[in-house]
Amino acid sequence: MKTIVVGLGLIGGSIALDLKEKKFATEVVGVDLRSDHGKQALDLGLVDQVTGLTQALQGADLVVLAIPMSAMNRLLPQILNEASENTSITDVGSTKGKLAQLVQDHPKRRQYVPSHPMAGTENSGPQAALRGLFAGKTAVICDKDQSAGHHLKRVEAMYDALEMRMIYMSSTEHDIHAAFVSHLSHISSFVLANTVLDMEKNVATIFDLAGGGFESTVRLAKSSPEMWTPIFEQNADSVEHALDAYIGHLKEFQSALREKKWDKIQTQLKRANEIRRVLQSIDDKKKVTR
């Protein structure tokens, strides 16, 4: 199976690496606007070759779009226009609603399978690609009834090869859930980093006092602004709703602190501890489905 990966950063590079090593693809062709990324991907063995998009699409069985959401809006319609009827197309973007609306009336819409592998790190570029990044994680497939069966099966086969468990929902549902479980955590990390940088003018003090808790909480602030700004833009309504809920909890905590209601704070912390049970059940489910 000739597989095209458009965008050779962390996610695209990791997909290319695993599909190549697991022999899911007979050939993995990379496409990237940045020539340095293309060269790095070749040098690292992530892809078999790097070409332009039009050339890559010749005889392609599967196209994986792994580029920033701002570029996705432009490139997905172009790929649908140029791809043969046999080519299956998926994207791995973090938002789905706006993209789904963009191509809903395209004559080749049924060749497209919107998806989102819920995996990643704060790093970017081909050198950030990781073997086994997706194993045991969840891939969300959206609006499956709008995709032709054989194209859906091809994308499902890809995620099987990546050892991911698959769940299905609408694009609208995806964007609401992603705002809470993914986008909000990145915003929290970005804002925490800015708060500390504003208040702690002496970088040495941050270095000396920061412990593991700070490092783990602020880790996502190292994520690419070029990737995340378009995500927030395209999912603005759901993200704003998530922020309203989050800020409400912050204000509730601040009020209890100001009024010295320590029992109320302890109750809030105990309730937050319930996330341990939720996360454990998620881990257990992943083990069962592997």
Could you describe each region identified by the protein language model?
Residues 1-58:
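NAD(P)+-binding Rossmann beta1-loop-alpha1 motif at the extreme N-terminus of oxidoreductases
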Residues 2, 27, 111, 138, ...:
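Residues at the starts of beta-strands that form the adenosine-phosphate
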Residues 133-219:
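Internal alpha-helical scaffold of NAD(P)-dependent oxidoreductase catalytic cores
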Residues 75-127:
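Rossmann-like NAD(P)(H) cofactor-binding subdomain of soluble oxidoreductases
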Residues 33-34, 67, 92-94:
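Short beta->alpha hinge that forms the Motif I/post-I loop of the SAM-binding pocket
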Residues 203-272:
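Interdomain hinge/lid region at the active-site interface
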Residues 53-90:
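Rossmann-like NAD(P)-binding element
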